[in-house]
Amino acid sequence: MSAQKLYGSHVPLAPLSRILLGIGSAATAITDPRRGDMVAAMGETTAVGPVLENIRRRMESDKIGKKLLMEKPRISNETIDRKWLAQLPDGTLGKHYSNFLERLNTSPDARPTVKYIDNLEHLYVMQRYRETHDFTHIALEQKTNMLGEVTVKYFEGIQYGLPMCVSGIFGGARLLTKNRSEFLHKNLPWVVEQAKTARFFMAFDWENHFESQLSDVQKELNVVPLI
């Protein structure tokens, strides 16, 4: 454990406290995915160092990913001009993102701040994951309902290996019978293939592609939309 406070929002945890918080937040997050605070806490307390380090190394091995690690750009209300996004042509990534935020009545700043990561490099990896999660929904054309969230979590679980994403398995068990059948026979085979063949999403500079058509972004990411 790092007893030293490494950044403004940092909350150092003793090993036992981390385990207990991880168990408690996981239990709450799985039963009530709307609890963003518990989902965030589960994500951080279960994201062990080797997992985050693997993501960091994969980013570092990619030209764009390495640049992201060096410059550490943020996606927030301060860095994103939402009025400009709203005025972009239909079909662009930026317009899709603007519509996504408006439809959910949310903002880039709605994501909880990272608190429980004890490594500054891993801090950015977790923050970047959190801030780009919405773009994964957009690139995969998945809604934010239970079916869409479970599908996205499977993608992230395979690509990133984060335990909180792997927990999407439990979310699948909570799907209604009709949606569960659709997920197992349609979404699951598709998303497994996409996660394996697509470009590593954590090494993609979404903010530099707002003016690009979503279809072109999907091609660059090697994503084939679900039919």
UniProtKB/Swiss-Prot annotation:
Instruction: Kindly state which keywords UniProt assigns to this record, in alphabetical order.
Output: Lyase, Membrane, Metal-binding, Mitochondrion, Mitochondrion inner membrane, Ubiquinone biosynthesis, Zinc
Binding, Zn(2+): H133, D134, H137, E149
Which reactions is this enzyme annotated as catalysing?
a 4-hydroxy-3-methoxy-5-(all-trans-polyprenyl)benzoate + H(+) = a 2-methoxy-6-(all-trans-polyprenyl)phenol + CO2
Example GO CC term: the record gives:
extrinsic component of mitochondrial inner membrane
Gene Ontology biological-process entries: ubiquinone biosynthetic process
Tell me which domain of life the UniProt entry assigns to the organism this sequence originates from.
Answer: Eukaryota
This protein's major location comes to mitochondrion
Cofactor requirement: Zn(2+)
Q: Which Pfam families match?
A: Coq4
The biological pathway it contributes to is: Cofactor biosynthesis; ubiquinone biosynthesis
The subcellular location is: Mitochondrion inner membrane
Tell me its EC number(s), please.
4.1.1.130
In its keyword annotation, does this UniProt entry include Transmembrane? no
- Topology versus the membrane, per the UniProt entry? Peripheral membrane protein
Matching InterPro entries: Coq4, Coq4_euk
Family affiliation: Belongs to the COQ4 family.
Misc remark for this entry?
Answer: This protein may be expected to contain an N-terminal transit peptide but none has been predicted.
The free-text function statement in the UniProt record for this protein reads: Lyase that catalyzes the C1-decarboxylation of 4-hydroxy-3-methoxy-5-(all-trans-polyprenyl)benzoic acid into 2-methoxy-6-(all-trans-polyprenyl)phenol during ubiquinone biosynthesis.
Question: Quaternary form?
Answer: Component of a multi-subunit COQ enzyme complex.
Its protein name is Ubiquinone biosynthesis protein coq-4, mitochondrial
Q: Name the source organism.
A: Caenorhabditis briggsae
Chain's gene name: coq-4
